[in-house]
Structure formats: structure tokens, C-alpha cells
Amino acid sequence: GVWHGKAPISDYDSEKSRFFSEYGFQSFPEFESVKRYAPYPEDWDIRSEVMMSHQRGGDHANWLIETYLLNEYKKPRDFRAFLYMNHVLQGDAIKTAIESHRRQMPYNMGTLFWQHNDCWPVASWASRDYYGRWKAQHYYVRKAYDDILISSVVEGDDLKVYAVSDRLENTSGRLQLQVCQFDGTVVPH
């Protein structure tokens, strides 16, 4: 799998099952929460003794977070940016999984990520930290479980777009796709 098996996040798009549960992706708490247990700047490093003591996923887990992050994004400029990008990474990983599971409807009819909250201030799979602060994952999950989902996935050279509805009645709509550059400029077709 993606976390324990160290597979790429994109592997979520190829997993098949009738029901998914207890899958997840770790992140640290947000910076304001971290400062409550690591108040000194010398501890603001994922390898510091304090940060390692607030990691219950094993000695390799902080390294794994960093490895995934650097595979997906540029190296963050500082510790605070690292925490922020780690939240984006966690959110994107879970969004990828949930959307993939929902696209498999009606073969797959359930998906429960791990986990909602923490019982201690720690790096974990939770979408809300010990202090109740929402991580990016919490926002991503809320959107990924919308009753109407528009989801895209790259398969080879193709971009496939899916519409998934959990509504009991038929729904119609109009979908407009645009390709944009990173600066937001729309690419003409």
C-alpha cells in the first residue's frame, strides 16, 4: 500500500476493493500546535529529539513523510513551510484515495480513511490534531465526500474525467474543462 508499503500516492488510483478502511497518510500537527510541545527553534526539525518523541509511527516515519514530500513537491524553505506542505501532501494523498474509491462505484461502496482525531499531540494519520485544529486533510476529505464529485485521473496519455453522484435522484449539469499554466493563464485549444 501507499504508506506502509511505501508505494507512490498514485497507486491509490489502481487499488480495487469492495470496501476500503483504515488507510491513511501521516502529517505533523500545524505549526501553532507543534510550538506547544516544541517551543524552541532548535527543536523545529523533524529529526530533533522532541519531534521524534512525538512520532509514534516508528523511527522511519518522519523520514517517510519527508521522502514522499520531496517526491511530490520542491524542498520547503523552512520548518514552518515543511509542516504546511506536509499537510497539503496528506490532504492530496487522502483525496486521491477517496476519489479513486468513489469512482469505482458500484463495485466499491465504502471508504473509511484512518483517522479523524488524535489523543496526544503527535505526527499521525489524523485529520484534526490533538488541539482540534483542522489539518488540510480535513478540508480535502470534506470536499472528496461531496454528494456530487467531479474527479479526474491521468491514465497513460489520457485525462479521464468522472462524475460520481450519491444523490438518489438524477442530476444534470454542465462541465467546462480548461487547461491552465501554473500562473493561471488558460491554454487555448
Question: Which positions does each model-derived feature cover?
Answer:
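Substrate-binding clefts and catalytic carboxylate motifs of secreted carbohydrate-active enzymes
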Residues: V2-T171, T185-V187
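Intrinsically disordered, low-complexity Pro/Gly/Ser/Thr-rich segments with frequent PxxP/GP/PP motifs
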Residues: G173-H189
